[in-house]
């Protein structure tokens, strides 16, 4: 959870190296080709080879094999599995049918399918088996995918995942929250609350904590109470909270009435850090677009896209655009979802490349084309495309998880340096960093011939200045702890005299330890701090946990946002808050449901 310093031997993927001892412990081997770990039991490839990922797969899928505990038994088991002699878990036909039904319900939830589509899946499987394996058609008799059963099973999976999260949360040394009130593109009445916690061995867990209905919790006090209730249920107190990541809406960051100020006030304690808040990670492109769209460009383009979807759908020149649109949110889309899709750098760049075709299309359907003769509007369009492309690149960098908060903050600082450079270049009319604007300016020069002012540099300097101020405001707290982030990202090169007084003795001792220096060189930072003795370095270890708990990416929020935009019509159907939370937990979690526990729970409820 720190910036990755320059090291002589370290590579980014060192944390993903297969360890031989995992074979007996978790029944996995290194695959013959590629990265990851190959499970000897189910032959599934576990792509992310971190020990916690391998362990979670084993605990969720193959708990049965824990009965082979002695070293000799374990070694014999591995050898049998290598030869394909699989000791089969003693599941009854009913239990196998229940596992299959649960797995299918989870898949339906992941794909955002409606409750009633389980019956269709059942019919498809029945037709397939009758034609291919007629002797096995009877196995479907125990698989129930009716709407009511599908709902119940999704809720059961949600409870199982939530219990796993709560069991881990009780051991969190520190945690942070991400509060997202902008994910719902169909209606703004839910707050998604995500948690990122760090366990005793610096194992990081990111998951959905709860969904809060803003219709029922309209006031900040009511929101605060709902969040506190969820934290209490998870066995967490505010004294362990280190950071808050939010959108920059007034509901979140209002100076006197925002939820952030309210939570920071409640979290004040002699034994905890001041809560670190930053509000620029979530929906960076979407929310920043409102600051840089100086001429309501996106609203105009939105009208064009609606026309294309209704009257130009068969035109070959627009097929790439329509395919891109449908891959994001399906064939049917509401106005707000379309508007949000247009506020992405990738989308605007594609539309800019089709502007000539769009002008011809608008002429053919009798729509106005006045914007294409408006010099100012065209320049604003080109500038918007370029600045949103730069924001897209930053957003992509912030979408990479497990890079640590300090590394993410490095990306922010680098972007701010770029903004300063953009300011100077615009002032000098140097459009090297603005290829779309340069293209528009060149076209206008060819059309006008005379030497006249094509674009106003001051206009775009003001936009860049506004963006700079917003970034400064959003990441103010990270600047406040920048020295701390640098210290724990590179402890062996940080001068002790610049460190806080409380940590100088430990830091000096750490830097003098040759063994620790060697470990630091060959391990990634997470592994290094996980192995650091809490008895010898209690302050460094404690702060390492806190730094590791800060959200380092917007990945989990983007995953939720993407899930909603792809399945907006399914999720717009009448759903209880409980069902909505279950769907989003299944869609965003990296945990595997405990299938054995779910089957056992089903048997106990249906003796």
Curated annotation (Swiss-Prot):
Presence of the UniProt keyword Isomerase in the record: no
In the record, what terms sit under GO molecular function?
identical protein binding
Q: Where can this protein be found?
A: Endoplasmic reticulum
Q: List the expressing tissues.
A: Expressed in heart, brain, placenta, liver, pancreas, kidney and skeletal muscle.
InterPro entries noted in UniProt: SPIN-DOC_Znf-C2H2
Q: Which Pfam families match?
A: zf-C2H2_12 (PF18658)
Question: Superkingdom, according to UniProt?
Answer: Eukaryota
Q: Which GO terms describe its cellular component?
A: cytoplasmic side of endoplasmic reticulum membrane; nucleus
GO BP, sorted A to Z: glycogen biosynthetic process; positive regulation of glycogen biosynthetic process; response to insulin
Q: Which keywords annotate this record?
A: Endoplasmic reticulum, Phosphoprotein
List of residues that carry Phosphoserine: 146
Subunit text: Interacts with EPM2A.
Q: What protein is this chain from?
A: EPM2A-interacting protein 1
Organism the protein comes from: Homo sapiens
> What does UniProt list as this organism's lineage?
Eukaryota, Metazoa, Chordata, Craniata, Vertebrata
């Amino acid at each position: 959870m720190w910036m990755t310093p320059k090291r002589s031997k370290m590579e980014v993927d060192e944390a993903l190296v297969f360890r031989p001892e995992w074979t007996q412990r978790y029944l996995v081997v290194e695959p013959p080709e590629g990265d990851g770990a190959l499970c000897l039991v189910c032959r599934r490839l576990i792509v992310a080879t971190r020990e916690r990922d391998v362990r979670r797969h084993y605990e969720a899928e193959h708990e049965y094999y824990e009965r082979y505990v002695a070293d000799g038994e374990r070694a014999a088991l591995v050898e049998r599995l290598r030869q394909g002699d699989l000791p089969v878990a003693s599941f009854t036909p009913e239990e196998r049918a229940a596992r299959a039904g649960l797995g299918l319900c989870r898949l339906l939830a992941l794909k955002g399918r409606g409750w009633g589509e389980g019956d269709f899946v059942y019919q498809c499987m029945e037709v397939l088996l009758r034609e291919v394996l007629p002797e096995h058609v009877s196995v479907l008799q125990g698989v129930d995918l009716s709407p009511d059963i599908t709902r119940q099973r999704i809720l059961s999976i949600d409870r199982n995942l939530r219990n796993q999260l709560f069991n881990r949360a009780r051991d969190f040394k520190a945690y942070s929250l991400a509060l997202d009130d902008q994910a719902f593109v169909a209606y703004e009445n839910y707050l998604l609350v995500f948690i990122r916690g760090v366990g005793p061995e610096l194992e990081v867990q990111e998951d959905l904590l709860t969904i809060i209905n803003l219709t029922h919790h309209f006031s900040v006090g009511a929101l605060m109470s709902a969040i506190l209730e969820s934290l209490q249920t998870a066995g967490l107190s505010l004294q362990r909270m280190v950071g808050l990541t939010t959108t920059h809406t007034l509901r979140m960051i209002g100076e006197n009435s925002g939820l952030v100020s309210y939570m920071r006030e409640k979290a004040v304690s002699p034994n905890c850090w001041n809560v670190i808040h930053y509000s620029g990670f979530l929906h960076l492109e979407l929310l920043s677009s409102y600051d840089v769209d100086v001429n309501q460009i996106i609203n105009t383009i939105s009208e064009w896209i609606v026309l294309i979807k209704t009257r130009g759908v068969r035109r070959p020149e627009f097929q790439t655009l329509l395919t891109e649109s449908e891959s994001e949110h399906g064939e049917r889309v509401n106005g707000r979802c379309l508007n949000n899709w247009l506020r992405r750098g990738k989308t605007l760049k594609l539309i800019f490349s089709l502007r000539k075709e769009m002008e011809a299309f608008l002429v053919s359907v009798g729509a106005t084309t006045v914007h294409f003769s408006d010099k100012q509007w065209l320049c604003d369009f080109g500038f918007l495309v370029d600045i949103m492309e730069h924001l897209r690149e930053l957003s992509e960098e912030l979408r990479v998880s497990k890079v640590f908060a300090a590394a993410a903050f490095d990306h922010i600082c680098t972007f701010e340096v770029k903004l300063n450079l953009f300011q100077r270049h615009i002032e000098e009319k140097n459009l090297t960093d603005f290829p779309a604007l340069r293209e528009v300016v060149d076209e206008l020069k060819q059309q006008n011939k005379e030497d006249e002012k094509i674009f106003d540099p001051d206009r775009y300097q003001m936009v860049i200045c506004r963006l700079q101020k917003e970034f400064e405001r959003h990441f103010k707290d990270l600047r406040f702890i920048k020295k701390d982030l640098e210290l724990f990202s590179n402890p062996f090169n940080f001068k002790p005299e610049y460190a806080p007084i409380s940590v100088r003795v430990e830091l000096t001792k750490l830097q003098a330890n040759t063994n620790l220096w060697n470990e630091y060189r060959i391990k990634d930072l997470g592994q290094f701090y996980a192995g650091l003795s809490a008895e010898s370095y209690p302050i460094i270890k404690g702060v390492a946990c806190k730094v590791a708990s800060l959200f380092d990416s917007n990945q989990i929020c983007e995953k939720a946002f993407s899930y909603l935009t792809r399945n907006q019509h399914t999720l717009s159907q009448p759903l209880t808050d409980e069902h909505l939370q279950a769907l989003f937990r299944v869609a965003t979690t990296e945990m595997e449901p405990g299938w054995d526990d779910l089957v056992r729970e089903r048997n106990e409820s249906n003796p």
